[in-house]
Design a protein with these regions (language model features):
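Active-site SXXK
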Residues: 37, 56-57, 82-110, 204-209, ...
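Short, gly/Ser/Thr-rich active-site loops of penicillin-recognizing serine hydrolases
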Residues: 299, 313-314, 319-327, 340, ...
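Short, well-ordered beta-strand elements
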Residues: 357-358, 364-377
Length: 409
């Protein structure tokens, strides 16, 4: 019966998506990003990139260069790529859903759902290979694991890049990741410092599994991806999808970028049995799909297709502003966010291979950047940022254009 109900929900969401009136997005007919980025593509330093600027229903889409330089395959908005840590925001949305529904509180102890976290130990010191541990005094909460103040390392031992089948998309499923983390010493007392951690976000996803009785990736698909029409996003892209993969490259100073077959933190084959859903970094997507998610955040929980994912107040209070104590930097639930929300505040996230998307819900602005690059330097960043400023100023100067507000009554 539960399975049948889920299938009916998916069917209903699909029907709503197909019947809803899509918001009109006008082409800006500008080339700010293309003009800024083309010289770097011509030099070979930038293999290929996707850049999107959006404000009030006016959008500039730019695809320059190649998804595969050797094959001379142009990069497109429908090519799949690994967004790495941008996956964290998707976990944040699923946590926010459960808070909105009254099923969890951000200040609930993690041990309420995962008993293995009842007693935790903190590494006090280490000398001559001997570690001294002390029992944790503070209660580890859901809020802490989602905003990187829980005290966990970046990745657990099973997900290190030097392990075959490891990396953030391999190593272990979510519940096993949580169990390993619970049995390992914390780096500091929970809630007292910041340590960027995929592990903490994976623990958050494991809590979603306990509360919902579903694998996290299934809950995400049914409650977020399918309702928004994000049909190209998954943790295991198909062989057919991978034919459109944006290939990975290493940045080289003053020289063309160098092809990289894989990074050890993202090991081939990308859809093999060693691949597990990682909430910290693991969701493949396309630029068109990613826009649907971030426009939903920009529109305070409402997808461009008219499907509501979260209430406005949920996005404002849980995602668009920091959930950390003051002075620890801005971060909410899997998303970079301002300590204090204001009309100039942006929230969103970036990923290890250079992707990012940020939104300003007050001004209905969005900027998306998609590349698959490792290392430095990245001399095009300044040029892209200048192009972004030019675009937003252009839209302000042409504000008489009928704009989509992002709201559906």
């Amino acid at each position: 019966m539960k399975f049948l109900n889920r299938m009916m929900l998916i069917a209903t969401m699909t029907l709503l998506t197909s019947l809803s009136l899509h918001a009109e997005v006008k082409n800006s007919n500008t080339t700010f990003a293309k003009d800024a980025l083309t010289p770097f593509v011509q030099s070979g330093q930038l293999p290929g990139a996707i850049c999107v600027f959006y404000k009030d229903g006016i959008q500039e889409n730019t695809c320059v260069g190649y998804a595969d330089v050797a094959a001379k395959r142009p990069i497109t908005m429908n090519d799949v790529y690994m967004q790495c840590s941008q996956t964290k925001g998707f976990c944040g949305v699923t946590i926010a859903m459960l808070v909105e529904e009254g099923r969890i509180s951000l200040d609930d102890p993690v041990s309420k759902y995962l008993p293995e976290f009842k007693t935790l130990w903190v590494k006090a010191s280490e000398k001559d290979g001997v570690r001294t541990l002390v029992k944790a005094k503070n209660t580890l909460t859901i809020r802490m694991v989602m905003n990187h103040t829980g005290g966990f390392p970046f990745e657990i031992s099973a997900k290190q890049g030097n392990i075959k089948g490891g990396g953030w998309s391999g190593g272990a499923p979510l519940r096993q990741t949580a169990a390993i983390a619970a049995s390992s010493p914390l780096l500091f007392e929970p809630g007292t410092r910041v340590q960027y951690s995929n592990t903490g976000i994976d623990i958050g996803a494991a809590i979603v599994e306990v509360v919902t009785g579903q694998r996290w990736e299934i809950f995400l698909k049914e409650r977020v991806l399918l309702p928004l029409g994000m049909t190209a996003s998954s943790f295991r892209p198909t062989d057919e999808q991978l034919k459109t993969q944006v290939e990975m490259y290493d940045c080289v100073k003053d020289a063309p970028a160098k092809y990289r077959r894989q990074n050890n933190m993202q090991q081939r084959p990308y859809n093999d049995d060693h691949v597990f859903a990682s909430a910290g970094a693991g969701l493949w997507t396309t630029a068109n799909d990613q826009l649907k998610f971030y426009k939903m955040l920009m529109n305070l929980g409402m997808g461009e297709n008219g499907v509501r994912i979260l209430k406005e107040e949920t996005v404002k209070n849980l995602l668009a502003k920091s959930s950390r104590p003051k002075g620890m930097g801005g971060y909410s639930l899997g998303l970079t966010a301002p300590e204090e929300d204001n009309e100039n505040a942006w929230f969103g996230h970036g990923g290890a291979w250079g992707t990012f998307c940020m939104v300003n819900w007050h001004k209905k602005q969005l900027t998306l950047w998609a590349v698959q690059l490792c290392g430095q330097p990245r001399p095009w960043d300044a040029a892209r940022e200048k192009a972004q400023k030019q675009f937003f100023q252009y839209v302000i100067d042409n504000s008489d254009v009928k704009a989509y507000t992002g709201r559906t009554k």
